[in-house]
Amino acid sequence: MKKAVVLLSGGMDSAAVIALAQEQGFAVYALSVRYGQRHTSELDAAARVAAAQGVIAHKVVDVDLRSIGGSALTDDIEVPDAGGDGIPVTYVPARNTIMLSLALGWAEVIGANDLFCGVNAVDYSGYPDCRPEFVRAFEVLANLATKAGVEGAGLRVHAPLQFLSKADIVREGVRLGVDFGVTVSCYRADADGRACGHCDACRLRAAGFADAGIPDPTHYAILS
């Protein structure tokens, strides 16, 4: 069976991506990153998703992005209740570049030619490393910078959610049997994974379920 490395944050998008990769016949190797995020509930969720969806292996890599800083997700910066103009303070500098690079390294080691990530450019917070241009550019980099790209069969970077609305992602996940109840999307989730209900991630998630007409299994502290 062909192998793929899938970035797994513990959120609803990455859970849906695992299911889509499996539907395409890939044996999924899930990679999560402990990058110094302020809460660990998303990594707990990643472990639940990996177990529930039967991945071949789930690796957690430590990278201390708190030492670089610059984000409300790693620093003592207040997470806003809603997105504003421009790139928000919840953007983590170079996060997707770093995570995809780690996935790329693991892919070479295990002989996988495919990387999957859950970036989205429709219902998203405006992060520059979620755009289609970024995904295409990283695939070019992957094939220039690796032995597998230069001497092997080449590497492909898949972003199957990039042009889907949040509602479409919910529908696809439900179709594939994803248990969204074990996922965590909130920027301010507590230790038990309860979502705050009013950050940008919570708003997008709640709207996705509402627009899809599917009950939202998320445990919210308060939903505004």
UniProtKB/Swiss-Prot annotation:
Its EC number is 6.3.4.20. SUPFAM superfamilies: Adenine nucleotide alpha hydrolases-like (SSF52402). GO terms for biological process: queuosine biosynthetic process. Binds 1 zinc ion per subunit. Gene3D superfamilies: HUPs. ATP binds at residues 8-18. Its cofactor is Zn(2+). This is 7-cyano-7-deazaguanine synthase. It comes from Xanthomonas axonopodis pv. citri (strain 306).
